[in-house]
Design a protein with these regions (language model features):
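A composition/biophysics-driven feature that prefers long, compositionally simple stretches
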Residues: 1-178, 236
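Short alpha-helical functional segments enriched in proximate histidine and acidic residues
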Residues: 36, 185, 202-206
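Short amphipathic alpha-helical leader/targeting segments
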Residues: 72, 182, 258-259
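C-terminal helix-coil-helix/basic helical segment that borders enzyme active sites and/or dimer interfaces
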Residues: 183-190
Length: 262
């Protein structure tokens, strides 16, 4: 009888989606990473942060209290995702995907182990993996050496490709659209939230037009007035604008996880 409560499984549901970048972009990133791994005699790397998983696989996760990962070896790139997301992580990943279930505690690590095997040495993100996760990693994977590769990987990410620069440049264009919409919405009596929504909606429409294959999330506007301008990160409120108010605006189009701001 088939196991109806597996620890992990694969689900290739639908067709692969169009990712933020072309296949050769991801292949180049992985090639540079694998060269670094080879130089450090490191058979495998486990990424856990949103930025590195997205950078190397194209998949931008939404954790909702669950861990996510991306295991890179010399011949595979595999995202590790929660059952609640079903086939979306596979569709949005450059490479393979393994899904872990919630039936038993630490099934995430069992899924990771199914891809890793026994590498002996594993690269991790020391600036992201918690101490508790590191202990569980050692116990469940039986890995003697965990090496922090976060600084090396950050150095690799800092050198932007032409494709990345094009995406960031378009983000700046979209930020300007949001700023113009905010300006048009400013009037005495308007609430901060009303003005912010005008800018956000304008940017999301612009992103959808320019990037029809993207996922749309995380684009927002900070718009503060009067006393609320005293802190850069004060949340948007329902305060109504008054004549003579100081105003502060920031528009943030996040296209496929790439940050730009006006």
């Amino acid at each position: 009888m088939a196991d109806t409560r597996p620890d992990f499984f694969t689900l290739e549901n639908g067709d692969k989606a169009t990712l933020p970048f072309a296949a050769d972009e991801y292949a180049g990133r992985l090639a540079r990473l694998r060269q670094m791994m080879s130089d450090r005699d490191m058979p495998a790397v486990l990424f856990t942060s949103m930025h590195n998983i997205a950078y190397y696989s194209g998949f931008l996760y939404c954790s909702f209290g669950r861990p996510y990962g991306c295991v890179v070896t010399q011949d595979r790139c595999t995202t590790i995702s929660a059952n609640i997301d079903a086939g979306q992580p596979w569709r949005r990943s450059f490479g393979d995907n393994v899904i872990f279930t919630d039936w038993k505690r630490d099934n995430y690590w069992r899924a990771v182990a199914s891809v890793l095997g026994q590498p002996g040495r594993l690269g991790i993100e020391g600036d992201h993996m918690t101490l508790a996760a590191e202990r569980t990693c050692r116990e469940m994977l039986g890995i003697a050496v965990l090496e922090d590769i976060a600084p090396d990987v950050m150095t690799l990410r800092m050198i932007k490709s032409a494709a990345e620069i094009a995406l960031i440049t378009d983000g700046a264009r979209v930020a300007d659209i949001g700023g113009a919409a905010v300006k048009e919405a400013i009037r005495v009596g308007a609430r901060e939230i009303d003005v912010a929504m005008a800018g956000r909606d304008a940017m999301e429409l612009a992103i959808a037009e320019a990037h029809p294959e993207a996922e749309y999330r995380d684009t927002w506007v900070w718009f503060q007035s009067g006393i609320n301008t005293d802190g850069a990160h004060n949340p948007v409120t329902g305060r109504k604008l008054r004549a003579g108010d100081l105003l502060s605006l920031n528009t943030f189009p996040l296209i496929s996880g790439y940050y730009t701001a006006l």
